[in-house]
Amino acid sequence: MSTYYSINNSENIDPNIIVISPNENSIFNFVFKSEQENTSYNGEYLEDIYYNLLKEEKEIKLKPIYGYMSKQKDINEQMRAILVDWLIDVHYNFNLKKETLFQAIWILDTYLSYEIVPRNKLQLVGITCLFISCKYNEICYPRTNEFIYVTDNTYNIKELLNMEKDILKKLDFNILAPIPIQFYDILAKIFNFDSEQYNLGRYFMESHLIDYNMICFSSSIIALSCAYIVMKFFSLKDYKNLYLINDKNNDYTSQENIQNEIKESARQLCFLVKNLNESNLKAVKSKFSLEEYNNVSQYCEDY
């Protein structure tokens, strides 16, 4: 992984299943057994959690606005990509929870949707978003001065704390929203992904954070498309069940729309990962080339 710096210087699925819900039409009726999971796990909670997240996703009012970059006067998509690539690197080196990263980028894009930011403050905004996300997600997190250090001391603690206040005020303290990794973790349990399969999906999921244009897709669609890519890559049979999960009412038109969204999102993700393999933004690829992530980024180099 790269060092810190200031960015202002420019197989078949197990056929055994467990019935877990009284609703016969629910895809959540079928959760595949996994020897690695606690067999006493009550799968009914998966359905409740998933649909509660889906409900929150549809009802949330303050969220990133696709197209916000057109209103920014001093920053652009490439600057955001460099910032996010750097934040992924910092997040890994700080050894933070996966949720912390996704929430930080959600806060970043939401703030940038409503606030004009000069380029000399963009890195400050980014590291402050990670700082805020740490406070919510982490039991123990780096000291304030460590967040300053990773910017090569471009800013000071007072500036960080003032930016924290400004972001929280602008977002009216609404910093929580369903994020892709929450949906994906449930899908991985439903379809019994092993470590290799799970990490391949995460590789695509973290890659999507870099591309500003992926904001047009909801968190649940991003998660479904990552699971779709995994299931197609490993030739898993039940990928079509992904089209049903977001449609609780078994509406054919809705399922068709969801299917189209998943396929388009997956297409863009594959294109993005291919381009990242050839770009200077190496944080995600380097991270997922490590053995702890099953070296999954190497799968995509010639695929």
Cite the ranges covered by each PLM segment.
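Acidic, serine/threonine-rich low-complexity regulatory regions at protein termini
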Residues: 1-303
